[in-house]
Amino acid sequence: MASAFSPATAAPAASPALFSASTSRPLSLTAAAAAVSARIPSRRGFRRGRFTVCNVAAPSATQQEAKAAGAKESLRPVYPFAAIVGQDEMKLCLLLNVIDPKIGGVMIMGDRGTGKSTTVRSLVDLLPDIRVVVGDPFNSDPDDPEVMGPEVRERVLEGEKLPVVTAKITMVDLPLGATEDRVCGTIDIEKALTDGVKAFEPGLLAKANRGILYVDEVNLLDDHLVDVLLDSAASGWNTVEREGISISHPARFILIGSGNPEEGELRPQLLDRFGMHAQVGTVRDAELRVKIVEERARFDRDPKAFRESYLEEQDKLQQQISSARSNLGAVQIDHDLRVKISKVCAELNVDGLRGDIVTNRAAKALAALKGRDTVTVEDIATVIPNCLRHRLRKDPLESIDSGLLVVEKFYEVFT
């Protein structure tokens, strides 16, 4: 989805000199990371002040432990995406979101033990490379001001040449026990008021910028945290506000959630914010079940050899994704097909226009994945159940699955 903020509103323009909140004394630019304007509470109300934005100087023992744990986790072998047997609906939804992040993420619901988490985490190997500014906690894009952190934006305005490196798109796991401060980031209020320095420690949303944020068991996450995640995913920005001091930074990420419907459903308002919805069921075919068990046993026995056996398929799929991302802008969808998509949404009483927008985007992403520059009726038929089923109003007396209702209405309108 398009960002609701422009670079001008996201971070105020830089000034030649930075000043302390309490005095007019300039702050040292060597200690400053970025200039940000803030409203400071005083006896006479609020006044404006200029602050420096920086990371907390010395990481705590907890942060160092977390970093070490993250390094160990990255060394763990990941099950190859190409080796996942079945679950084509879930895999397609994930691939389409990687090709076009503006689809708005995917919610995966299904039985326990069906490979939801394994499939999502296996996506890591297929993610394309991106250019990022070296040492920036927000994974800033050196060429796009809208996805630059405040420090990088300030350096660009000063004409500094930024060191750039190519890195893989990151996937960040959000644990169920995460606090709001850990997710959004924290501001050291005492340091801000006494030293005039806005010491900001970025959270998981900053780390996930230009990447993927995965929430396992999202239906068990606190509602207010889900609201924060969905708002950031929709707007592309995260704002942290404490005691009248606020910081905004880019937070553009693909939100992927998974859960078991037996443990509780998400509120309809929250479900609607996910671009696509995939249903995962237990494989019933005996031959497929045996194949899954055997493949898993091979992976557990020798992960390295197992991954190497799928290297060619993985490379082919990665090239296909990279090509689709490059050609996505050239894909066209006929006006008549757009009208029919909107007619399906209207006749299904889908609230709002998110269903129309996401269906158009997903159909174009699928056409790009197949190497075409024109959307066909078959493309729309493939993606429309995943784009609309979670947006239908639930009728307790209705015995037909919502996905089947979408399919029935699709063929009624398109034939």
Swiss-Prot record:
Keywords from the UniProt entry: ATP-binding, Chlorophyll biosynthesis, Chloroplast, Disulfide bond, Ligase, Nucleotide-binding, Photosynthesis, Plastid, Transit peptide
Segment annotated as transit peptide: 1-67
Classification via SMART domains: AAA
EC number in record: 6.6.1.1
SUPFAM superfamilies: P-loop containing nucleoside triphosphate hydrolases
Cystine pairings recorded for this chain: C93-C184, C345-C387
Biological process, per Gene Ontology: chlorophyll biosynthetic process; photosynthesis
Pathway named in the protein's UniProt entry: Porphyrin-containing compound metabolism; chlorophyll biosynthesis
Principal subcellular localisation of the protein: plastid
Regulation of catalytic or functional activity: Redox regulation; active in reducing conditions, inactive in oxidizing conditions. Thioredoxins f and m mediate the reversible reductive activation of oxidized CHLI.
Key word ATP-binding present: yes
Molecular function per GO: ATP binding; ATP hydrolysis activity; magnesium chelatase activity
Record has Nucleotide-binding as a keyword: yes
Catalytic reaction annotation: protoporphyrin IX + Mg(2+) + ATP + H2O = Mg-protoporphyrin IX + ADP + phosphate + 3 H(+)
Subcellular location: Plastid, Chloroplast
Biological role: Involved in chlorophyll biosynthesis. Catalyzes the insertion of magnesium ion into protoporphyrin IX to yield Mg-protoporphyrin IX. The reaction takes place in two steps, with an ATP-dependent activation followed by an ATP-dependent chelation step.
The family this protein is said to belong to: Belongs to the Mg-chelatase subunits D/I family.
Protein name: Magnesium-chelatase subunit ChlI, chloroplastic
Species in which this protein is naturally found: Oryza sativa subsp. indica (Rice)
Source organism phylogeny: Eukaryota, Viridiplantae, Streptophyta, Embryophyta, Tracheophyta
Primary gene name: CHLI
